[in-house]
Amino acid sequence: MKNICQKAVLLLLAALLIVSCQSKPQRVKPAPPCAPAKSLQLMGYTIQAGAFAKVQNAVRLTETLKDQGLDATYFLAKDGLFKVRFGNFATKEMARQRAQRLRDSGIIEEFYIVQPEDYAVAKRKRYGTYYLRESLVKTAREFIGVPYLWGGTSRENGFDCSGLTMTVYQLNGLNLPRHSATQYDAGNPIDKRELQKGDLIFFATNDNGKVSHVGIYIGNGRFIHAPSRGKTIRIESMSCSFFAKRYIGARTYL
C-alpha cells in the first residue's frame, strides 16, 4: 500500500511538471529606455567690444549695456586687456545690426562678432573634452578675488554663486541657465567619485534642504565659488565641514 501511495505521488508530480513545461512562458516586460542625456544649448553669435587696460572702464561699459537690456559681462583676455561680451544672437547679421546701432549711438566703438566656432566648446571635437574642461577651470580662476553680491553678475557689483558659473560656461560657449536650481535641473547627475574638472557641485546652504549654492569643480576635491556676501570668489575644499555636511549632488554638462 505504501509503495502504491509513493507511486501515485510521483505520478502526480510528474504530471504537474509536464503541464508546467508546456504552459506558455510569461512575457517579460522590456526595461524602460534610459532617459537621454541632457545637454545645454550652445551660445550663438555674441558681440565683443572694448579693450581696456583699466578694469573700471570695462565695468562702465558693462553697466551701460545692461541699461540697454543686454546681458553683458567682461573678462580678462589673453592679451592682458579687459573686454566686454554681450548678447546671444541667432545669426551673425542680427548681431552685426545690433552692434551697429550701439556704435551709431556712441555706446560702443569698434566691435567684433564672436562666432559659435570661436568658443572652446566648438574645439572639443578637435582637442577632446579634456580641453573644454581645462578651459572652464582656467576661466573660473580668472575671477578669483572678485567680491560676492547676491544677484550680481558684473565684476563691479560682484558675482553671486550661480552668476559666476553661468558666466564661466557662457564664455566657453555653453548657455547655462541663470539660477542654481535651474542649473541643477539642467545637468546630468553624477556620483561624487565621478567628478571631473568643470563639473558643477551643489549645496543646500539654507534650512529648507533645497539647492541654494553652486561651485565649479577644479580637481583634487576642490572647487571655485562665490561665497557669502562680503567675501570674494575663492577656492574651497569639498572636505570642509561646512560644505561636506551640505553637499546635495553634482551635475555634468559635457
Language-model segments: which ranges?
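Flexible loop/N-cap segments at domain edges
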Residues: 215
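Acidic/polar low-complexity segments and flexible, solvent-exposed patches
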Residues: 2-149, 154-197, 208-211, 219, ...
